[in-house]
Amino acid sequence: MDITRDDIDAAARRIAGDVRRTPLLRIAGRELGVDCAELWLKLEHLQVSGSFKARGMFNRMRADVVPAAGVVIASGGNAGIAVAYAARALGVRAEVFVPASSSEAKRARLAQLGAVVTVRGASYADALAASLDRQATTGALLMHAYDQREVVAGAGTLAAEVEADAGVPDRALVSVGGGGLIAGVCAWFAGRSRIEALEPALAPTLAAALGAGCPVDVDVAGIAADSLGARRIGDIAWSLARRHVAASHLLADDAIRAAQLALWHGLRLAVEPAAALPLAALATRAVVPRPDEKVLLVICGANVDVATLA
């Protein structure tokens, strides 16, 4: 299931006109209280649709023929929003299945982007089963939030941009839910950068898989569950992460929240909890870089109510 740098280069060409080349903010570590030479913040919260997910969703749609039935996905979070955004931009129909537990605000945003929003079941698993049934019935192109080759290759394009802008970081800190993001980063930087996974303690998909020796279901809760709410690490991510991720760190909700507020008060970056995990790992000293290191923090999304950052 390897994704190659050639796959990522092809994805970058495919989606160049659809997504933003987001800024890479380079600051001294001391600006955020970290003892390292430089922090490189890849600002994917400024990406179209509000997260890195747009890269993979555009790549999936551009790489395949989208049938008249359009596309279908199960997601109440950033992936669904990215699919709705990409489908509208490309003029295709999108149906997003969400569980009853999804927020009204997210459903409203999906509808505002032009998606057909269908509520099915109490959990993501229920919504996923319904989306698979719909795909089988209609022939729509099935989109997955993180476990498709085109989606992972799309995510990897942000790592390619980092290297083009600044070189290869000594260390890359990446938030993990289903694993599409870290899979893309692994595919690009494997063997050249120390890649570390950051997970909420209440949603430890990769840590659980590493402990069990294979992907397993986990219970998901906590502050970052909206965007890191997968119950199991993806197969593609597992294939790459078990070989190329140096460590997985679990972070408490209070540390994630403190880092989210620090990014707002210190740099005026309004980001979702998932995007704050890299800084939380540094602030709690779960990750301790060498003083001469250049450390990449992937700021993955902006699915946040700014009123909560006051």
Model-flagged regions — what are they?
Residues M1-A310:
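PLP-dependent amino-acid enzyme catalytic core
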